Amino acid sequence: MTAPTKMTFFSRFEADILAGKKTITIRDESEKDYQPGTTVEVSTLEEGRVFCQLKILSVEPIAFSALNEFHAEQENMTLETLKEVIQEIYPGIEQLYVIQYQRV
């Protein structure tokens, strides 16, 4: 399987990514195939506007119920907000994946 070369984010997360305040993304199984060491082009989901490149550092499975304050800090939000956002995007999904990255 070929690793994905593109990643999208809601535009509301762009500033935090560019500022280095958001260093992970939590995705469902359909987006678990990113490979550590690869670089992806990042664009806004709404407009498809490219705004940076990210190097994938790790991809780790996690249960929704195991999310904690450390994950929230890496997402630059409170744990309560993080869980609300994830439920909004992936309603009812328990198995998720934490993708850690750095801007290049």
From Swiss-Prot:
Chain ranges of the ASCH domain: 7-93
SS bonds (residue pairs): none
SMART domains tied to this protein: ASCH
Catalytic function, reaction form: N(4)-acetylcytidine + H2O = cytidine + acetate + H(+); N(4)-acetyl-2'-deoxycytidine + H2O = 2'-deoxycytidine + acetate + H(+); N(4)-acetylcytosine + H2O = cytosine + acetate + H(+)
Coiled coil: none
Similarity comment: family membership: Belongs to the N(4)-acetylcytidine amidohydrolase family.
The name this protein goes by in its record: N(4)-acetylcytidine amidohydrolase
